[in-house]
Amino acid sequence: MKANELREKSVEQLNEQLLGLLRDQFNLRMQKATGQLGQSHLLSQVKRDIARVKTVLNQQAGK
């Protein structure tokens, strides 16, 4: 996901996406804790996506 794509979305869409990413992060953390996570890179990828969405939300709130 790219920041340019996120800037085109509305605040409601960004909030929905943020909620979905937080759920994904929770599920990945649970898989890691139980030893079921085979692709550990997904944790950092989701973390970065969450940061991107939050950054765009803050930028839009400042306008």
Curated annotation (Swiss-Prot):
Molecular function via GO: structural constituent of ribosome
Pfam families with a match to the protein in the record: Ribosomal_L29
Any one Gene Ontology BP term: translation
Keyword Protein biosynthesis recorded: no
Alphabetical list of InterPro entries matching this protein: Ribosomal_protein_uL29, Ribosomal_uL29, Ribosomal_uL29_CS, Ribosomal_uL29_sf
Domain of life (superkingdom): Bacteria
S-S bridge residues: none
Keyword terms of this UniProt record: Ribonucleoprotein, Ribosomal protein
Gene Ontology CC, one term: cytosolic large ribosomal subunit
Family: Belongs to the universal ribosomal protein uL29 family.
PANTHER family, per the entry: 60S RIBOSOMAL PROTEIN L35/50S RIBOSOMAL PROTEIN L29, LARGE RIBOSOMAL SUBUNIT PROTEIN UL29C
HAMAP family with a match to the protein in the record: Ribosomal_uL29
Protein name: Large ribosomal subunit protein uL29
